[in-house]
Amino acid sequence: MWASEIEAFPIEVTKQRFPSMIHVGDITKLNGAELPPVDIICGGSPCQDLSVAGARAGLSGARSGLFMEQVRLVKEMRNADEQRGRAGHAVRPRYMLWENVPGAFSSGTPKGEDFRIVLEEIVRVKCGSVYVPGPYPWPWQSAGRILLGTDFSLAWRCLDAQYWGVAQRRKRIFLVADFAGRTADKILSVSYTHLTL
């Protein structure tokens, strides 16, 4: 188990809570092919650029743009695993999780374009040149899924932390991609509208 973090306080928290955690440093300086293989990559790019309370710089903003680094690492890790001779369900990481604010549903031009790009970039980990359409002129739904053949699924759901043991109302989008099957919507218990590519 490893983590990519550069802030001192979060590093100290993980050292206390997960003493065996390996800290690998700044995500922008990592090469996915050199990282120890894992089954899941979890990330939540800083939300200030996507938040309705922020400047709305979107994915092109310096902070929320770290999402692209997460996708790059997943691609590099999966490519390295394939070069080692792994195939199909054995290629790691099998799963990717992304968490962010509901403002991602409306960030970008046209409204919601940033969330469309998030979906498209994750789908492209599995299928390099696919286009994911937006819901325009309607807004993104709070839950949904994408299926690509029989060996890829992606699902998202907006959850409120108050129902998960946190003493505050704090809604977040959780997105899960399964690069080798159709379990993403089961993981999030999603009832949804879906798009089959």
Q: Language-model features: where?
A:
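N-terminal Rossmann-like NAD(P) cofactor-binding module of classical short-chain dehydrogenase/reductase
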Residues: 42
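SAM cofactor-binding core of SAM-dependent methyltransferases
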Residues: 1-28
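Class I S-adenosyl-L-methionine
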Residues: 30-38, 50-197
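Short glycine-/small-residue-rich Rossmann-like dinucleotide-binding loops
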Residues: 46
